[in-house]
Amino acid sequence: AICVHGRTRAQMYQPYADWSIIKAVKDAVKIPVIGNGDVTGAQSACRMIEETGCDMVMVGRAALGNPWVFREINAYLSESCRIMPPPSVPERILVIRRHIELLCGDKGENRGMREARKHVAWYMHGLKGAAEMRKKAGELCTLEDLDCLLKELYTLSNH
């Protein structure tokens, strides 16, 4: 298989990915093609496959703080366009806690928590009070700090 991104490195994140490049590669080769670029969820994954003929899609930035995007895409593509509900706040909290716990287990709490700040901030996108939660995520130093933030997130979500 070959993976093709619809943008050059020099373009970085702008403009939108040019999916016609992916289609041109797919039309030119006989091996599976994986399309990448601006796949943000189930509908964009489906649209990319329809527009380019690619065999699979690759998700990049859309997975940051949203590991559920893979579940969403799989359900949509394999279950007749089934739309998955977004994860509940308790589910998000469990995943955040486990992710950061594993990160700290691998890198030590001090280094792990410094790296965790960006991950926790990504997980907060779209939630009630997200801006304030992201600010607090930038100040996390310990797993205990994370637990306090997650309790606050849970409380906010229930009001």
Predicted regions, residues:
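Alpha/beta catalytic cores of nucleotide-metabolism and tRNA/nucleoside-modifying enzymes
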Residues: 1, 13, 20, 24-35, ...
